[in-house]
Each structure stands twice: as C-alpha cells, then as structure tokens.
C-alpha cells in the first residue's frame, strides 16, 4: 500500500502531503521486513519465438538482447535450446550456470550491502520458452538456494501454457512468484510494426489467466514506440491497470546498433521520443497508479557505444533525477 512519507527535503511543500510511490524495494520491505535483492540470471540456450522463426523472424525491431541484459554480454550462448525437444541435452550446463551466476552475485551483494534475502530474476530472452521439465529443474534449483524468497520470470505471453501456470501456482504456495510479461503496447498496429509476433488479445488472455492463479504479474511498457502518441501510451498504461497487474516497468525506446530499428532510424522512418515527453508520460502514469501497484523501473538506458539515439538515454541517473523531481512537484516521492 502507498504510505505517507515522513522524510522530504522539499521546503515548498507540506511534508504531510507527500505520498511515497510504492517501489519494489518498499513492497518487499513491507512484506519481508527487510530489503530483498534481485539477482539477474541469463541462461544460455534460451531464445525467443520471433527470433527462431516460430512466430516471426528477426526478433523485435528494437532488440539486441545483450544491450538489454548486461549479464549476457560475458556469457555468449554456445548453443541454442529447441523448446520442443523432450529431453534437454544442455540441462546440466544450464543448472551449473544458474548456480555460478547466482552465488557470484549473492556474494557481491552480501559484501557491498549486507544483503540477506534474494529473488532470482530469470532475465534474458524468453524464460518459459523451453521444455516443461527444463523449467521445473531450473526454477526448483533456484528456489533451493539459501536465502532465496522467490522467483521473477521474464517471458512473453505467447510462451505461457496452462501446464507452466500449474507448476508456478504450486510454487507460489510457499514462495514469492512473479511473472514479468513484455506488454510493450496494446496497439496491434504497433506490435506488427515492431515485429512482436504477438497481439493484444493474446497478451490480455494470458495476463488474466496468470492473475487467476494468484501469481504476481509485472508488465513491461515501452514509451516512444513508432508512431505512438502520448495518448496511445497512456491508453496502454490504463489497459494494463484494468488487467490488475501488480507492478509495472517503464522503458523508453532507444536505438542500439545491430537492430532492425537502426535501419529505420537511419532512413528517417523512426524519430525517438524526447526526454521531456518521456518524463511527462511516466509522471502522468505514476500519478494515476492505484494504491498497491508497485513500480519496478521508471526508465532504462545504455552507457556504451552501441547506443545511437536518443543520446539522453546514455545517462540513466540523470533521467531518474528528472523523474524524481517531476514527481515531487506532483506530491509524489519516488
């Protein structure tokens, strides 16, 4: 639940009128009475159905997965898992990779922050796009690690099944289980334009089914998609809220090298969102969040040479600062 902040350095606003945005950190602190740290995991062999040709080829026009998942850059996959095989020949390697990544990150967080509780975040590519036995082995292994309170699983709605939901529902009886769906937009013409390979009806169907199992859902929204107006972005936000998602992540669309979007940008067919419009749209969204819905991310960026545009996405800390300041003017503390 959103609580009243007792600490605010603003001299021009009544402290008692400042509301705290329910960040994920605050959500976990309220529930577990101490901070919970996400440990991002990138398992080699996973891919996406719009990369391998199942629903499309080439992937989303904006996606160069390494750029969105830094953990993957040092762990280039040497094999690709066929999601339709009965037996996964790479499972032992994947389980070992999971263990090595988790404990390396856990130790770093313990040393730096004194971390005591963790949630394992299956981040890169589509983390339900694999044989069910593989998913069961990976998720069960992750939950067996000391001090792990749950899982967060990044995936697509077209890669969810009733059988996977059965398993996750069973896990959720004892653990905190989150499913993170890449919604991006509820406009089918936009989803077609970015080669998403999924449609709004299917997205809504599986979010609804996931919620019916009592599982937590985090929706990822991208602001600044091709030809989308602020009205369209806010409509996507409102539709996500209507689906009763538990949390949201906001991302600006930026152009990185080696993507289909790069070609559109260089031909003048795509104009990136301005920082001012992005900040304004995120602030308008957060202002209209119902109580109890958390915000896991307000922006994203990339600081290396692969970023082509917009250049304001190079400095994520600057973006967050501007969003914080804009929210504070609206009586909200992020």
Where are these regions (language model features)?
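Core AdoMet radical
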Residues: 68-105, 109-132, 147-160, 176-202, ...
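Hydrophobic faces of well-ordered beta-strands that scaffold small-molecule active sites
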Residues: 39-41, 118-120, 151-153, 177-181, ...
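Acidic (Asp/Glu)-rich catalytic clusters
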Residues: 109-111, 139-146, 166-176, 208-212
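N-terminal [4Fe-4S]-dependent radical SAM core
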Residues: 2-59, 64-119
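Conserved C-terminal portion of the radical SAM core fold
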Residues: 201-260, 276-299
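Short amphipathic alpha-helices and their capping/turn segments at secondary-structure boundaries
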Residues: 102-109, 160-174, 234-244, 287
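Auxiliary Fe-S-binding modules of radical SAM enzymes
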Residues: 2-40, 71-72, 247, 254-334
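Distinct, well-ordered alpha-helical segments
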Residues: 132-140, 161-170, 194, 233
